[in-house]
């Protein structure tokens, strides 16, 4: 018995229609279905669910590093930054990174959920940690 993959990512949103537009227009999501309070999109090969929940306090989101990260090609990195700026997306200050840890852009959606666009892979991250984070214990080879 095993878990085979991430099934979907669900975001609680305050306004379904504006969130659909954000995920379609900004992240190039493909809208699959929408209803009164729920919509499904795909971004890359990832199923994104949006559930409208208007009366949920959203201020706790800004205090957490919790986020979802999507992969982008490194050659498109500057283009993505420009795209997000042109569309007035709330770009966050990223954490300091070693170049071996690849590149990331952090920003928020309309409800403050943190999203990352990252140029590295899991293998890249593990190789970086093996070289730079000698205090870490590794369990599998990549």
Curated annotation (Swiss-Prot):
The active site is at 116 (proton donor/acceptor). GO terms for biological process: response to antibiotic. It comes from the Bacteria. Mg(2+) binds at residues 8, 67, 116. Its main location: cytoplasm. GO terms for molecular function: magnesium ion binding; transferase activity, transferring alkyl or aryl (other than methyl) groups. Residues 5-120 form the VOC domain. Keywords: Antibiotic resistance, Cytoplasm, Magnesium, Metal-binding, Transferase. Metallothiol transferase which confers resistance to fosfomycin by catalyzing the addition of a thiol cofactor to fosfomycin. L-cysteine is probably the physiological thiol donor. This is Metallothiol transferase FosB. The lineage of its organism: Bacteria, Bacillati, Bacillota, Bacilli, Bacillales. The gene is fosB.
């Amino acid at each position: 018995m095993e878990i085979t993959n991430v099934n979907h990512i669900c975001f609680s949103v305050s306004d379904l229609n504006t969130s659909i537009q954000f995920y379609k227009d900004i992240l190039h999501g493909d809208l699959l279905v929408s209803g009164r309070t729920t919509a499904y999109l795909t971004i890359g090969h990832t199923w994104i669910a949006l559930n409208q929940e208007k009366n949920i306090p959203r201020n706790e989101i800004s205090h957490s590093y919790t986020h979802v990260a999507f992969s982008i090609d490194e050659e498109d990195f500057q283009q993505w930054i420009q795209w997000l700026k042109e569309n007035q997306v709330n770009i966050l200050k990223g954490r300091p990174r070693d170049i071996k840890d690849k590149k990331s852009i952090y920003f928020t959606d309309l409800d403050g959920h943190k999203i990352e666009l990252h140029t590295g892979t899991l293998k890249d991250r593990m190789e970086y940690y093996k070289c730079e984070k000698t205090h870490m214990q590794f369990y599998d080879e990549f």
